[in-house]
Amino acid sequence: MSRLVEDFFAFLHVERGMSSHTLDAYRRDIGALIAWGGQQAVGEVVALDRAQLQAFVSAEHRRGLSAKSLQRRLSACRGFYTWLVKRGHIAVNPAAGLRAPKALRKLPRILDADEAVSFVQIPTDTPLGLRDRALLELFYSSGLRLSELCGLRWDGLDLDAGLVSVLGKGSRQRVVPVGSYALSALREWCASSGGGAQQPVFPGRYGGPISARAVQVRIKQLAQRQGMAKHVHPHMLRHSFASHLLESSGDLRGVQELLGHADITTTQIYTHLDFQYLSKVYDAAHPRARRKAR
């Protein structure tokens, strides 16, 4: 990759505080543009014009890339060219105004309240059981992102006040309440593990923070062990937290703050889940819900 591309990634990491996960996605997206440019012999990516970028998007679409992936790929390219304009390397952003096909937004799958409670209540008669119980309870209690949970240290938890402090997307810090069941599980796990303030709450095999992949695999194993029909994954617990909280409170802004969403439109998807639930209740209970008018 060119020096300018590497400088752009350094800018995203240092000045924008972009996580390594998002940065890797940007690298793949910009890398795809560079690879396409090499195949088409169109020259350096910094010199591409609007028509060439549109041809790139069309080629990716024909290759079978989903609308969501195309939108993300175009967003990365748009950000790169915006940065080039601001740094004075090019005069016009060739990606400005380009649009990818709209993605159909799927509603997130969730556990209902009974399923969620049943899932997190695993036996705690072993050290691994204590860890897993604390991990699941905290996930469902506070709606953390997977990356936030993996990176959590003991000094980010205030067990007396019942609060957890995490560094979310864009290096935005937020403080989220921790429920009583999660606090109890965390206290037991703390007493068993003996972790210091600077130590990860959930250490991996070699003492560092547990990996996202390890959590994904463990949650899948626990769900299968309980005979759950649904494919349970870490983000499902976050989705369930948000949906159940919104269902009980109706406070969209409050749920937005707890989830750490910068844009409330991201949170609004849970209102559709809530409406979906209410529609099912209505259809099942109302005497005239499914009857045809005479």
UniProtKB/Swiss-Prot annotation:
Q: Where in the cell is it found?
A: Cytoplasm
Q: Name one GO molecular function term.
A: DNA binding
Q: Which SUPFAM superfamilies does the protein's record reference?
A: DNA breaking-rejoining enzymes
Recorded hits in PROSITE patterns, A to Z, give: CB, TYR_RECOMBINASE
Q: Keyword Transmembrane: yes or no?
A: no
Checking Gene3D superfamilies in the record gives: 1.10.150.130, Intergrase catalytic core
Q: Name one GO cellular component term.
A: cytoplasm
Q: What is its main location?
A: cytoplasm
Please provide the record's keywords in A-Z order. Answer: Cell cycle, Cell division, Chromosome partition, Cytoplasm, DNA integration, DNA recombination, DNA-binding
Catalytic residues, per the record, are R145, K169, H235, R238, H261, Y270
Q: Where in this chain does the record put each Core-binding (CB) domain?
A: 1-85
Query: Which Gene Ontology BP annotations are present?
Result: cell division; chromosome segregation; DNA transposition
User: A Pfam family name for this chain?
Assistant: Phage_integrase
Source domain of life: Bacteria
Q: Ranges for the Tyr recombinase domain?
A: 106-283
- Assembly state and interactors? Forms a cyclic heterotetrameric complex composed of two molecules of XerC and two molecules of XerD.
What function does the entry list?
Site-specific tyrosine recombinase, which acts by catalyzing the cutting and rejoining of the recombining DNA molecules. The XerC-XerD complex is essential to convert dimers of the bacterial chromosome into monomers to permit their segregation at cell division. It also contributes to the segregational stability of plasmids.
Protein family according to the UniProt entry: Belongs to the 'phage' integrase family. XerC subfamily.
What is this protein's record name? Tyrosine recombinase XerC
Organism in which the protein naturally occurs: Xylella fastidiosa (strain Temecula1 / ATCC 700964)
